Design a protein with these regions (language model features):
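Stable alpha-helical elements in mature extracytoplasmic
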Residues: 93, 97-100, 128, 161, ...
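N-terminal leader/targeting and pre-domain segments
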Residues: 24-81, 170-172
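Solvent-exposed loop/turn segments at secondary-structure junctions
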Residues: 89-93, 119-122, 150-152
């Protein structure tokens, strides 16, 4: 979603000066270009402010989860029948997903504890890489239901919504 928005913004930003200069005299084009630049800066500041708010919210939500480490994940020390969330604060998709997860979980009064594995250092921490491989995690955010029979169910938002998925896994 963010990729589409960024592409659309890029196209608009690139084509706006062309259309403005084609429709006005040179002095008006200069004024329009200045206005366009100010608008771009304003939009950029709004995006930065939005990202800062999401980062703060991410940190607050993660505090309500049970933070875990890769060793506990690899050694099956997490209580089955709960959720395991792979993510990191620097991931824009994780920052967008986490408030939705928290809100949906609260709305459905899910009985699950949510374990959180911070994948920030996955590129240099082999244990985190192994934990991700164990559950076939290729990217974040990833949410997994740890079945009581030692299996697992991965949320795939291309196939089901988070509320639908909660309804499915609450039947296990």
């Amino acid at each position: 979603m963010k990729c589409i928005r960024m592409s659309l913004c890029f196209i608009i930003i690139c084509t706006t000066p062309f259309f403005l200069s084609a429709c006005t005299s040179s002095s008006q084009a200069s004024e329009s270009s200045t206005i366009s630049s100010v608008s771009q800066v304003s939009t950029s500041e709004n995006e930065v402010e939005h990202d800062l708010k999401l980062t703060k919210l991410y940190k607050e939500i993660v505090k309500s989860f049970q933070e875990t480490n890769a060793e506990d994940v690899l050694n099956n020390k997490l209580v089955k029948g709960n959720l395991l969330y792979f993510g990191r604060e620097t991931c824009p998709f994780c920052r967008e997903f986490l408030p939705v997860l928290k809100e949906t979980s609260d709305l459905y009064h899910t009985p699950f504890k949510i374990y959180y594995l911070n994948t920030e250092d996955s590129h240099k921490n082999s244990q985190i890489k192994k934990a991700m491989e164990k559950y076939n995690v290729t990217g974040v955010p990833t949410l997994i239901y740890l079945k009581k029979d030692n299996g697992f169910e991965v949320l795939n938002e291309e196939q089901t919504t988070l509320p639908e998925w909660f309804n499915i896994i609450m039947k296990y």
